[in-house]
Amino acid sequence: MLDRLARFFTSLRLTVALLACGLVLVFWGTMAQVQVGLYQAQNEFFRSFFIYWSPSETGLRIPIFPGGYLIGGMLLANLVVYNFQFDRPGKRNFGLVLIHIGVGLLLIGQLLTDVFSTESMLHLRNAETKNYSESSTHFELAIVDKTDSATDQVVAIPAEQLQRHGVIRHASLPFTVQVQTFYGNSVLAEKQQAGFAQINVSAGFGAGAWWRELPKEAAMDRRDLPSGIVELLTPQGSLGTFLVSAHLNQPQEFDCNGRHYELLLRLERFYKPFKLHLVEFRHDKYPGTDIPKNFSSRVRVQRPETGEDREVLIYMNNPLRYDGDTYYQASFDPDNHGTILQVVHNPSWLTPYFSCVLVGVGLLVQFLRHLIEFATNRKAS
């Protein structure tokens, strides 16, 4: 049995089949982005073990093709088993072993990036200071205890949890959150329109307004705007039903047990132990044209607990790497008075560099070994 498994995982046919499946997957996933958008295509094709097909109105999910995790995992197993079975380390194949380790590390690094990396955006206006960045696609229901004027106590509930409906409890809250309705993408209207339903809430904003669920956005320059109705419940009774929506920019206020709270559905936040202050944003153009020459943001990094206070210039191809995050110059406001920085947190960002070095050294060692052997044999003859 073990011999059969070893022969299967060391088979060259398996390697070729997996590489062919990888080519099909990349082409298929790239084309699917037109219909479902980049992020959904990544999750369905590349960050999954199988690609599923769902017959209309059945709710079934039938696997029809291997996904990125399965293909990558099988390639890694093929590589590891082959080395243990046939390519045991030695002087003659040291370069080949380095190449295989580099390729394997590249596969593992991609998995670690998918699992642990996060991307967010930091929008700063001139002279503005923030200690958090925001997701560009994911939302959260923030319940903020504003009783203490010096410190806010925040409980954030991911929108994905709201989509499952049910009752949500948290040890820091004297009430529970009952999700009555939640739409992953929606539109609101002040007056009745065709296909819209009336919003029935007893507190906060939205009473008398109308809403409708929308399909998920596929365009890269647009995002889903979720909305829902939640009821806040205490052992003594209901605090009211509230409309929570990404369309609402102002928090809704309420009191419970002598404490003052705010309720807001907002983009997911990633708080930092430091602050970034925008000193100046520059958008330089070539003289006499509208062609951009340079985008740059001069920011001040402030960390009171360590006394750090310094200025850093961020521009294209010159990001700020700080505290495990990388800040790239991504965009800017149309009036040139604000900047948008892309924030990437990737603990395994060095893995591809190590992989390329190992593969390069392995190729060099293998080439030099063959060259020396060829020169020696030719001299001997």
Locate each region found by the language model.
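Membrane-embedded alpha-helical segments of integral membrane proteins
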Residues: 17-88
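Membrane-proximal extracellular juxtamembrane segment immediately upstream
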Residues: 32-58, 62, 312-374, 378-381
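Internal alpha-helical transmembrane segments
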Residues: 13, 63-152, 179, 340-378
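Soluble non-transmembrane domains of integral membrane proteins
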Residues: 115-346
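Hydrophobic alpha-helical transmembrane segments
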Residues: 10-16, 43-52, 293-309
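Alpha-helical transmembrane segments and their helix-start/interface "positive-inside/aromatic belt" motifs
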Residues: 2-23, 95-103
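Short hydrophobic alpha-helical segments that form membrane-spanning helices or hydrophobic packing faces
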Residues: 18-22, 109, 329-332, 362
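Solvent-exposed, low-complexity, intrinsically disordered
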Residues: 2-9, 46-49, 53-54, 88, ...
